[in-house]
Design a protein with these regions (language model features):
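Bacterial N-terminal signal peptides that target proteins for export
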Residues: 1-11
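Beta-lactamase-like hydrolase cores
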Residues: 27-72
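Structured C-terminal helix/loop/strand segments within mature extracytoplasmic catalytic/sensor domains
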Residues: 29, 243-350
Length: 350
């Protein structure tokens, strides 16, 4: 009987040990991510009183936009938004529209069609250069400068002006996650003063580089540049690129990862006009600016940044916008070319 009691006690003890040994280990605290909101707030406070730059005035309506307008948005690929300043006031999207229409055309016709019919090289000329067209031996322009952008817009699928416009505005709306509209005063102002773009389109047509009616294509391009956006819209647009073409807020598939890949390559090459090289040298992210004061930056797989601040530098890029993006990228160590050693250096022999 005593032996039986010992055996029973041993079984009970063994059971206790088993129970104890299978108890789930304590969970370690999950690592915290970047404090995006604090970083955005800090950047806003740092630059809100900066007075450098000047509104674009070659389009009369842009000169009337308040020069102190300033808003920052950052949207992550999981759909979280962090903002500071004025994120509601609208400005015209201007040249940022170029990369959304580019993404649509790549989606419809493939990346090779853009390379063959427009080009993907930097021109080394100003964004609205006419001489760049005549100096080219082939299709060495790109969709981020006016000649290439107008040609790209002419490639949008549709059997009528209305069908093409629906494709353009729907694409912009899907990227931004809401129905966007045109700023009619800006559109009318640009349409009345876009003789240079009309000339560019006619010259492209003469060189067989326009793929639809040049006058109507120029008007479509002018209209897309007048689409209204705010800082949050721009951040969501950038985040949609960062998320491989799926809007991280709405979940809508806007374009494919392949279209994003090739669009970002063109943005990295020529997204900030004459200062694209300087931008990439310091920021290391694909970006796109517009003379309305907007700017976007895309950190693939992580987040998108959008800034609205109308005063521009000599190259036509938002002064505050560039500084904000550079600060945020530096703080987040998000430069795509920032590489830490993978294999440590060998120990020095004594």
């Amino acid at each position: 009987m005593k032996h039986t009691g010992i055996i029973r006690a041993g079984l009970i003890l063994t059971g206790l040990v088993l129970i104890s040994s299978t108890t789930a280990p304590k969970k370690e605290a999950a690592p915290t991510g970047p404090d995006y909101q604090t970083l955005v707030n800090t950047a806003y406070a740092k630059y809100k009183d900066l007075k450098e730059g000047k509104n674009a005035d070659y389009i009369p309506a842009l000169a009337e936009v308040p020069s102190d307008l300033f808003g920052i948005g950052l949207v992550t690929v999981d759909g979280k938004a962090f903002t500071a300043g004025d994120i509601q006031t609208m400005v015209s999207i201007q040249s940022i529209s170029k990369v959304l229409t580019l993404a649509r055309v790549i989606e419809e016709q493939g990346a090779q069609a853009i390379e063959d019919k427009v080009g993907v090289d930097a021109t080394g000329e100003v964004f609205n250069s006419i001489t760049a067209i005549e100096r080219m031996k082939g299709k060495e322009i790109n969709s981020c400068v006016n000649p290439g952008a107008i040609a790209t817009t002419s490639m949008v699928k549709g059997d009528s002006y209305e069908a093409k416009w629906k494709s353009i505005i729907d694409t912009h709306s899907d990227f931004a996650g809401r129905a966007l509209t045109v700023n009619e005063p800006v559109y009318k102002s640009e349409a009345a003063t876009n003789q240079r773009n009309q000339a560019i389109a006619q010259l492209l047509f003469a060189y067989d580089r326009m793929y639809w009616d040049p006058a109507k294509s120029t008007d479509l391009y002018t209209k897309q540049c007048a689409i209204n956006v705010n800082a949050h819209d721009l951040a969501e647009i950038a985040a949609t690129f960062a998320n491989g073409g799926i809007n991280p807020v709405t979940g809508k598939v806007v374009v494919s990862p392949n279209s994003v890949e090739h669009t970002l390559a063109v943005m990295a090459t020529a997204g900030l006009y004459d200062d694209s090289g300087i931008w990439l040298y310091h920021v290391g992210l694909p970006g796109k600016s517009g003379v309305g004061g907007g700017i976007i930056a895309v950190c693939p797989g992580k987040f998108g940044i959008g800034v609205v601040a109308p005063p521009l530098d000599a190259a036509g890029n938002s002064v505050k916008g560039q500084k904000v993006v550079r600060d945020l990228v530096d703080q987040l160590k998000a430069n795509l070319y920032l590489v830490q050693p993978v294999v440590p250096a060998p120990a020095k022999k004594k």
